[in-house]
């Protein structure tokens, strides 16, 4: 049933899956965390409201999240080839996986930060806290 070649193929498949998942998750958080913070800050109830920036980021996230992954995979093939050098394989799959994960992470960060009570943020502002301090510590 499971000969040596089959076990090696399964081990390679497990390694490739872990590699793609971990690397794309890392880059998804690297992109999604600042995206979520920017969404929270520029919201109309945020610390630095900016309707134009918020709308642009919001539209990008909503559009990216609504595109099925297979279509996203095909649509970003030229970008993948530009960044990785080829459009197939486990390393090339990281690009569309990251682009699919980042908006999800950004939206989760935004919703988590919006749960911070407004009174706590107002208290920090009244004590002279800067925006960066509020984002990091409050």
Model features per residue range: what roles?
Residues 1-8, 45-53, 133-137:
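Short, membrane-interfacial amphipathic segments enriched in basic
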Residues 12, 16-20, 65, 69-104:
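Loop-to-helix entry region at the N-terminal start of transmembrane alpha-helices
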Residues 51, 89-138:
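Membrane-cytosol interface at the C-terminal ends of specific transmembrane alpha-helices
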Residues 1-2, 35-45, 80-82:
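Structural signal for alpha-helical transmembrane segments and their membrane-water exit/capping regions
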Residues 10-41:
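Transmembrane alpha-helix signature in integral membrane proteins
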Residues 38-75, 97, 107-111, 115:
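Cytoplasmic-entry segments and transmembrane alpha-helices of multi-pass inner-membrane transporters
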């Amino acid at each position: 049933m499971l000969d040596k070649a089959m076990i090696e193929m399964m081990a390679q498949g497990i390694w490739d899956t872990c590699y793609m998942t971990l690397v794309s998750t890392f880059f998804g958080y690297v992109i999604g965390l600042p995206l979520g913070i920017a969404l929270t800050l520029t919201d109309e109830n945020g610390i630095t409201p900016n309707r134009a920036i918020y709308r642009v980021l919001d539209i990008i996230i909503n559009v990216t999240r609504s595109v099925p992954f297979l279509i996203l995979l095909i649509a970003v093939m030229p970008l993948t080839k530009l960044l990785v050098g080829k459009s197939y394989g486990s390393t090339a799959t990281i690009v569309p996986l990251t682009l699919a994960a980042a908006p999800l992470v950004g939206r989760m960060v935004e919703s988590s930060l919006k749960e911070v009570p407004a009174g706590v943020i107002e208290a920090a502002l009244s004590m002279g806290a800067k925006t960066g301090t509020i984002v990091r510590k409050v």
